[in-house]
Curated annotation (Swiss-Prot):
Protein name in UniProt: 3-dehydroquinate dehydratase
GO molecular function, one term: 3-dehydroquinate dehydratase activity
Record InterPro entries: DHquinase_II, DHquinase_II_CS, DHquinase_II_sf
Pfam families assigned: DHquinase_II
PANTHER family, A to Z: CATABOLIC 3-DEHYDROQUINASE
Organism annotation: Mannheimia succiniciproducens (strain KCTC 0769BP / MBEL55E)
Functional summary from the UniProt entry: Catalyzes a trans-dehydration via an enolate intermediate.
GO-annotated biological processes: amino acid biosynthetic process; aromatic amino acid family biosynthetic process; chorismate biosynthetic process; quinate catabolic process
Active site: 26 (proton acceptor), 103 (proton donor)
Length: 150
């Protein structure tokens, strides 16, 4: 029997406030509800999914490093770190785990400082502006990506 594929869902700063934080941009679902939706997809697809959220760059980097040779794919919403964190980008490059960048809002329809991402050019794909549905789309892509590698 083959080993389960492992996917890590990472969420960056302030995403623990989803549901209460700026619903116009981020919707009304909590992070727990989004994670539960993705966990349900993981169960249907026989995928091991770990969810992790941190407001600190250091904790996110440590989690990425701990995933080295233990995780097959990463789904990441770097949140505000999208526009500032070379260190987080470098951590993803160091572990060489394929990943998809996710954003609830369309960062290109927002303030100009949100238009640049330090992750997009090294991600397998970028999903933005689809709200919580973007997490499901990213998960489905990861499943297809891993199936092609198998």
């Amino acid at each position: 029997m083959s080993q389960l594929s492992r996917i890590l869902l990472l969420n960056g700063p302030n995403l623990n406030m989803l549901g209460a934080r700026e619903p116009k941009h981020y919707g009304t679902l909590s992070l727990a509800a989004i994670e539960a939706n993705v966990q349900a997809l993981a169960a249907k697809n026989n995928i091991e999914l770990e969810c992790f959220q941190a407001n600190s760059e250091e904790k996110l980097i440590d989690k990425i490093h701990q995933s080295f040779k233990k995780v097959d794919f990463i789904l990441i919403n770097p949140a505000a770190f999208t526009h500032t964190s070379v260190a987080l980008r470098d951590a993803l490059l160091a572990v060489a785990i394929p990943f998809v960048e996710i954003h609830l809002s369309n960062i290109h329809k927002r303030e100009p400082f949100r238009h640049h991402s330090y992750f997009s050019d090294v991600a397998e794909g970028v999903i933005c502006g689809l709200g919580a549905k973007g997490y499901e789309c990213a998960f489905e892509f990861a499943v297809e990506f891993l199936a092609k590698k198998a």
